[in-house]
Amino acid sequence: MPGLRADQLALYMQDMYKAERESYEEMPTMHDKVFKMVSVNKGAGDKVTQILGAGDLQRHTTEGQDINYKTPVQGWEFLVKYWTYSDGIALSKEAVEDTVKLGNLLKELAATWGTSERVEKETLGSTVFNRGGDLAGEWVFNGTHTGNTDSSGDLLYDSYPLFNVTGNARSTKNGGTYYNSVASLSLTPANFETVYNLATATNNRDERDRIVKNPVDTLLVEPGAELFKARRIVETTNGLPSSQTNDKNVYEGIVSPMAWDYLDDSSAFYVGKKQSKDFQFRIRQKAELRFFRDENNLGYKASINLRMGILIKNWRVWHKGGGSYA
């Protein structure tokens, strides 16, 4: 058959987009349930500067007392880089023009890309948890992009790992010290309570060390045995392990258990708030498919590319029990 016309290329592209999307949606994803999904349309990345405000309100002790005007205080700088992901394939002129089922070939190719897109998004999101305790950090936290250098490098915005333990406590802008992880914990009712209280009753402080609400709604674990443990802890009405069978389970319904296939950090468990505005999965560009002729050799090329990144603005959103901190 002769070379493909422009209208034929366009029709193939429509089928490829449909096949890619259908393949992507074949299996449910978790990154969009853990993170808040945000679409953006410009820039190689983004920088958000935290403003702490002027401080506490002052009680007036005399009539006519002047208002004390102060300059707003800058907090942390949060950076995100939009990473580009791509893949491509080259087809010879003969392979395309001699193939009677070219449409099927292209749809199968696009379907594999749909699966790959799902895998990469799940991997990007889960890396935040799997490598969040690494003392040297991880690339996913490095927001350096054109025009902006992330001074914290591969660590979180305050130059600490996302998940830090008591021996490596982080400081707020006001000087308070905090940690959001406890090492060497397995998932038990008592250990769940320890991490839950750490999140809601100890780390319920802002950058000025003032008391704030720090709600949690999710117990995030690996699938399999860890999920069964989680469900027994928060979904059992009576008779927790090591308790009387008629004792009421005080943990019932306090959070919802969720399992993520992509978690791999030594049976660690995480207590936090899903889809928080301070834990963002940003889509800079949706998957773009291309199918075109290469005039150099008269062959054809097909490709996919997309851009995405992670923006974290508050280490308090998720807390961790167990896992590694090397």
What are these regions (language model features)?
Residues 1-27:
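N-terminal alpha-helical "arm" segments
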Residues 2-10, 39-48, 66-68, 80, ...:
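Short low-complexity stretches enriched in small and charged residues
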Residues 2-7, 149-209, 213-218, 223-326:
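Sequence/fold signature of self-assembling virion shell proteins
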Residues 10, 18-19, 73, 204, ...:
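Short alpha-helical segments and helix-capping/turn motifs at coil-helix boundaries
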Residues 25-85:
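Assembly/oligomerization interface modules of large self-assembling protein complexes
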Residues 56, 66, 79, 115-139, ...:
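Signature of extracytoplasmic/envelope-associated structural regions
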Residues 77-137, 219-220, 300-304:
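Long, contiguous amphipathic alpha-helices that act as assembly "spine/axial" helices in icosahedral shell
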Residues 99-108, 131-153, 206-208, 213:
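Intrinsically disordered, low-complexity coil segments
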